[in-house]
Amino acid sequence: MARASLIQPGLWALLLLQAVGPAVAAKLNIPKVLLPFTRATRVNFTLEASEGCYRWSSTRPEVASIEPLGSSEQQCSQKAVVQARLTQPARLTSIIFAEDITTGQVLRCDAIVDLIHGIQIVSTTRELYLEDSPLELKIQALDSEGNTFSTLAGLVFDWTIVKDTEANGFSDSHNALRILTFLESTYIPPSYISEMEKAAKQGDTILVSGMKTGSSKLKARIQEAVYKNVRPAEVRLLILENILLNPAYDVYLLVGTSIHYKVQKIRQGKITELSMPSDQYELQLQNSIPDPQGDPARPVAVLTQDTSRVTAMQMGQSNLVLGHRSIRMQGASRLPNSTIYVVEAGYLGFTVHPGDRWVLETGHLYAVTIEVFDRSSNKVYPSDNIRIEAVFPAEFFEVLSSSQNGSYHHVRAIQSGQTTISASLTSVVDQDGGVHVLQVPVWNQQEVDIHIPITLYPSILTFPWQPKTGAYQYTIKAHGGSGNFTWSSSSYMVATVTVKGVMTTGGDTGLSVIRAHDVQNPLHFGEMKVYVIEPSSMEFAPCQVEARVGHTLELPLTISGLMPGGSSEVVTLSDCSHFDLVVEVENQGVFQPLPGRLPPGPEHCSGVKVRADAQGSTTLLVSYTHGHVHLGAKITLAAYLPLKAVDPSSVAVVTLGSSKEMLFEGGPRPWVLEPSKFFRNVTSEDTGSISLSLLGPPASRNYQQHRVLVTCQALGEQVIALSVGNRPSLSNPFPAVEPTVVKSVCAPPSRLTLMPVYALPQLDLSCPLLQQNKQVVPVSSHRNPLLDLGAYDQQGRRFDNFSSLSIQWESFRPLLASIEVDQPMQLVSQDDGNGQKKLHGLQTVSVHEASGTTAISATATGYQQSHLSAAGVKQLRDPLVPVSASIELILVEDVRVSPEEVTIYNHPGVQVELHITEGSGYFFLNTSTQDIINVAYQDTRGVAMVHPLFPGSSTVMVHDLCLTFPAPAKATIHVSDIQELYVRVVDKVEIGKAVKAYVRVLDFYKKPFLAKYFTFMDLKLRAASQIITLVTLDEALDNYTATFLVHGVAIGQTSLSASVTDKSGQRVSSTAQQIEVFPPFRLIPRKVTLIIGAMIQITSEGGPQPQSNILFSINNESVAAVSSAGLVRGLMVGNGSVLGVVQAVDAETGKVIIVSQDHVEVEVLQLQAVRIRAPITRMRTGTQMPVYVTGITSNQSPFSFGNAVPGLTFHWSVTKRDVLDLRGRHHEVSIRLSPQYNFAMNVHGRVKGRTGLRVVVKALDPTAGQLHGLGKELSDEIQIQVFEKLRLLNPEVEAEQILMSPNSFIKLQTNRDGAAILSYRVLDGPEKAPIVHIDEKGFLVSGSGIGVSTLEVIAQEPFGTNQTVLVAVKVSPISYLRISMSPVLHTQHKEVLTALPLGMTVTFTVHFHDSSGDIFHAHNSDLNFATNRDDFVQIGKGATNNTCIIRTVSVGLTLLHVWDVEHLGLSDFVPLPVLQAITPELSGAVVVGDILCLASVLISLGGVSGTWSSSAGNVLYVDPKTGVAIARDAGPVTVYYEIAGHLKTFKEIVVVTPQKIVARRLHATQTSIQEATASKVTVSVGDRSSNLLGECSSAQREAIEALHPESLISCQLQFKQDVFDFPARDIFSVEPGFDTALGQYLCSVTMHRLTDKQLKHLNMKKTSLAVTASMPSSRTSVEKVGAEVPFSPGLYANQAEILLSNHYPSSEVKIFGAVEILENLEVRSGSPAVLASVKEKSFGLPSFITYTVGVLDPTAGSQGPLSTALTFSSPATNQAITIPVTVAFVLDRRGPGPYGASLLSHFLDSYQVMFFTFFALLAGTAVTIIAYHTVCAPRELASPLALTPHASPQHSPHYLASSPTAFNTLPSDRKASPPSGLWSPAYASH
């Protein structure tokens, strides 16, 4: 019991957590467990939770223990076993608790252990059938109260079969039943039953089976000795045979028909028939009920016992019953029975099998059944003696067989089509053969559709496999059937099929069978096979590989594949047109692969098509790759331009002795694989009259042009032919050959022509002067004209070359125009525009800027002999007849046109004039485009009239027909329809005022039309409603705008739109311009009263909505200041006016305009006195009343001083504390406001009495002048009377009433609503005016009067009793209102909150009270809520009229004002201070890398802390449980702290990138030997000294370590000076870390084990280590300040050992190291015979000391080698090295001879020295090992925080085996504190 009492407090805590904790989804499988008390066995029960992992515990393990099942590493499980452990018979309870290790949720289960009071056997039935499935019997145990035990698992029972004393008729009844074990059956028992059966025990569940028919009794008792007095449970079971009646269903018969019944028995799963009549069973007809029109004396049916046949006699019904012949069995069991209905036939029905659909297929067999139904649609049994006549049309059906009664027919459909089957029930044949014909035969017919079988074409399709699903599609054609099919595929991975029969290949290889099922009968289908095989090879078939540019080549492909099923058979695919081929062209741009593939042909299955885009050759590669399959085929292609004659195109004409270079282009080029096959051939008809030669290199591989030089040697005509191509080859089996021909003409000239040369091509029009005078041409008098001389033959063909002619030039008036000698005629071959080059003789004529007329002539006098000789002309037969030409020139000025550009409106009535001046006077006008404008030239006026025809732009070109000049005069005409209308108007106008609207009409180019066109457009401006009026103004803003005046006449919103009528009569409207007529703009409040330092926000009403922008200003800035948001702050006593201006921006000009304005008077004053605003001074006990402080006038509300800075403090008191309670306004939610916010309080009446309520208002800073006369405080006091509520003392009953305000209503509800009939009545007398009214539904309505009425409520109960309630209804005016707030806030350690948490949502409820303080049940107040500013809280309407919702959004003080609109006296003020609820307070910005320990005192009602979250986890990650936050990236973030279902607060944090990251070396005074090789560098991220912000709890510190913040930084190290040839990372390693104690990041630097080479190099030169830190994730540059860490590699000796002898008694050794080590270096010898002295000290680079080592005793070593050691040590760093010293004594064996000893003696001497040296080395090694274990044994060291190598003697035991030098620490009495740095403790010195 003592132990139990110790557990109780924890239990109550767990119970409390469970009671108040939030509801979660996890549940236990049972809330209470009832277990039986046992001694011999243990009864178990398994508890299981729905989810989670739990720790289980029991409050009383001695009653019930709990053991987890399958416990995990966290020592938790989802299941546990409860076991009864009670040792004494009693009823005791233990509580089982399960605590979720993740959420802390606690689940409970009560485990009750009690005695079994009684048992009973339960089963699903009490009847068993012989040899049927066994029956399960189970025992239920009950306690003394009748409760059922949860389990009896493990409890042993004795089951026995006893004789049934009641079964008198059964012999040996106890042998009729058998008890089975589950092991003998096929059923799975509970696990504990299996275990008990293995131990030959019986549990609470058994199986029994019937052995023979009869009755048997089964008894079960508890074997446990404690339950020997519990009465055994008994059950009686009946074992029966399983008898069936066939048919077992109800049967419908026609009169005269019969049915044969069978009696069957089920045994061992088989059905056997009993022969009837039987000794055991008999059939009987009972309960014969004839039809009402039938004969009651006759039976409905007759049963023939011998045949078990029932014959229907008349209509009605009768029951057929199978009964026992034995009397004792008749009541013992229930045998089957059937009901027989004798009915009249109603109609016939048809069924067909298979398919049960009357859509058949020719050639198929079908079973047609004709069924008879009565009028109720019951199916009539088809007796053999009915006769149905069926008609199957012979042309459609072949009847194979039919039943005797005609109800069944076996037929075959033989022809397709539509037909009808008919049948009629005609008669019934009795047993004697008599035929009874039905008076009205029953007839029906069935329509049948017969189709031919469905066949699919083709029957087989073969496709290559491709990885892309759906690469191939094929439309399968289906023939036969109804024509409407459903398609299916046997393997959708191989091929799929759509509803239209489109087959699509899948992604696998194999076979798919496609089936088309007839929709009208799915049993009918056709099928075909689709093979998808894997391709194995691919090649191109022989084809043409050369093509003209623009032509297409078809390249056929032959693709083979492997048949599926593992066969190696290779077959050519017949169709691979959709093969997923990759076509690649080596030279891009020559051939373009075309989409699509070639259709399959006899020699190919697919192919690609390419188009020749440009001449050239390329290689085309077609490949296919997927997995292990890679196919490819390559072919070379060539493209060529068509061979054509370029110059001349058909005929070339030259003079004798001239030549023509004929140009041909295109044709096939040399075949790239065999260029030698290329050829060109040129021929002529007569080789003697012309000379032919091919130009260009003959071996060129790039034949794009072919030049043939033709020279005229005799007059006449010749045909010249050129052919180009390649000869056939293996790679080009079908080459292309291109031929072409031209004619060459050699003739004398017959005429010459002279024409002026124009700078630009002119129109094909002649000058009228030229037509009149034939050779008169006007030219400009300012430019030298160029004359073109041309020659023509007799047929009028122009000569291609006439250079062999001799030409003479002449001018008739050289003063106007002359031929200069220095400007001879230039012979130029020019293109005539179609690629033909003709020879032109160009002669320049010099003009002298004078007007007039002159003539120029040219004459061909003969041939030039030099040309004839060069051409090889043999003989000139006829001399040339001279030919000449002349031209007359008129010199004039150039033409001009104006205006040069104009835009006109497309309207028939619009025209524009173009003025044409200067020129020759002969003009031709045309336009650049057709159908845009119509131009008419009036030559008499010199004006061109332009009329618009169609929208667009056109250029009018004025051509001077008689003047050559560079270009015609031009004027650009823009014709445009109306593109859009643009309305510009200010979108806001105050009612009663006006603004101007401007309208422009824009053309296609968004340019405005001239206003003169508006008359053609019918421009109108309209408003959508009548709230504005429009007046057209005559004033013009410019030449493009129409102006209107817009008057606002009514408030609202409307739109303005302008419209015009275009050329076609259609109205074109502008975009509607929204315009708002707004009410006068008003600022609220109309007057502002403030004290100095107080603040209020001015809001507005009216004005445009939404208000785009309001600018506030004040006329007296010394009195008050106003912000852009309208916040007014009092500065000094005085008056001012705040002006609010509503502005808008003009959409077109961008200027700001004033839409409306208003002003508010501001008064800043000092508080002269204060008053307590109390709505009543007499209040009833138990009621509440709000009070607040005001000034002496009504304007001086809490809004005037409640938020002043510096503030006022309010101190409240009462003279009698027991009468009144003073409570803060937020007392109900556990917020205690500071005195600065207590201008409003709640007064609670406690006991009757009279007391004074006093307030003292103090100024925090009297010098601020907030109180009158710089006073320090003001006060006020009122008296309040508290009185008791009237009560009845005798009798002591409560008299309640309904309190309502005038004109309010309430719906009354009772606890009898819906159960009783309620009536309501007001009991006022007839002479009294009713105060309230109530209707029959309980709606109680008060009038405008006040008073008291009595209401009667009567409930008429359904059981006859009436209940009556009389209630007083008081109608009273509202005296005051009071505000309350919810929800209640809870803190962790009952801390007092002083403000609302930031981010919290609270609900304010307004309560209404009468003059006594009672709360109204109904009211009609219309409440308004307002705040003095809107930037700290957000306010909104609540669910009801008397509530509002406020959400705190920023830190600061807001004042809330609530008032009744109709009753100005009903108001209240509440302060709403808002503070952060999340700590810590951050003085500056958070930098990336900072760690915050966030905390909040807020908890849930159950004491559970909330969860943390972050709006941006990538910026600031927050641990949801502990509140640890890590700044990971820069940016703004919001941290949320949420108590689920209660509140949610937040804190806004800005994370910035640190400006710098500073690393500092951490100085430590003492470390252990394990730390001797490491140095730590602290890293400060940002400007703070610590990156850990806030007070961190132990749990938060653990969370920080788990989050690994050090992953945010990385550490780098390098030598400060680059003096080594290896990087610092070869010597040192660095790891980042974070120290929660320091609140800083760390870089731990560790020195590696050094090699001898590294050790030597580090001692030769000196530098330090620079350690820096960075943030890899930083996207901006960050200043990095590194830390300098000095290090020392340790001592190093230039000798590994010293060998001394009597011949060499001394030696030198150098010890290298740092200066600070060497300055205090000490040496110690292991033997007094050996001494070391300093010879030299060098503290430069490198630093070393040279020691002389000598032997003091010359005889040392004479008795044997002397082995010792020198130890060099530094007390500053605890470093030491040991050098072995060996002293040997060597005898001198040299004789006195001149050459010393003999060779033998030298050998002996040498052998002796070698032998001695060997033993000396052995001794030295022994000394080294001894020194190692002596000096380097582990001990506690006082070493600095130094970076040294990791290798220590205990870490590298093999190190000294290869080096005789070792590191030794100094004795403890010589330890010293060295300077901080990095030191090396142990290295070899070689």
UniProtKB/Swiss-Prot annotation:
Q: In the record, which positions carry Phosphothreonine?
A: 1844
Residues carrying a glycan: 337, 484, 681, 1039
Domain of life, per lineage: Eukaryota
Question: Sites of the modification Phosphoserine?
Answer: 1839, 1873, 1876, 1880, 1885
Which Pfam families does the record cross-reference, listed alphabetically? Big_2, Ig_NUP210_15th, Ig_NUP210_16th, Ig_NUP210_1st, Ig_NUP210_2nd, Ig_NUP210_3rd, Ig_NUP210_4th, Ig_NUP210_6th
Q: Which GO terms describe its cellular component?
A: endoplasmic reticulum membrane; nuclear envelope; nuclear membrane; nuclear pore
Q: Which residues lie on this side of the membrane: Cytoplasmic?
A: 1829-1886
| Biological process according to GO | mRNA transport; protein transport; protein-containing complex assembly
Topology Perinuclear space: residue spans = 26-1805
Q: How does it sit in the membrane?
A: Single-pass type I membrane protein
Protein keywords: Endoplasmic reticulum, Glycoprotein, Membrane, mRNA transport, Nuclear pore complex, Nucleus, Phosphoprotein, Protein transport, Signal, Translocation, Transmembrane, Transmembrane helix, Transport
The record's subcellular location field reads: Nucleus, Nuclear pore complex; Nucleus membrane; Endoplasmic reticulum membrane
The similarity comment for this entry is: Belongs to the NUP210 family.
Domain BIG2 positions: 1078-1151
Alphabetized PANTHER family for the sequence: NUCLEAR PORE MEMBRANE GLYCOPROTEIN 210, NUCLEAR PORE MEMBRANE GLYCOPROTEIN GP210-RELATED
PTM remark: N-glycosylated, but not all potential glycosylation sites may be used. Contains high-mannose type oligosaccharides.
The species this protein belongs to is: Rattus norvegicus (Rat)
- Leader sequence segment: 1-25
* SMART domains per UniProt: BID_2
Q: Whom does it interact with, and what assembly results? A: Forms dimers and possibly higher-order oligomers.
Residues passing through the membrane, by range = 1806-1828
GO MF term (any one) = structural constituent of nuclear pore
Residue span of region Disordered: 1866-1886
Give the protein name, as stated in the record. Nuclear pore membrane glycoprotein 210
Coiled-coil blocks: none
Record bears the keyword Ligase: no
According to its UniProt entry, the function of this protein is described as: Nucleoporin essential for nuclear pore assembly and fusion, nuclear pore spacing, as well as structural integrity.
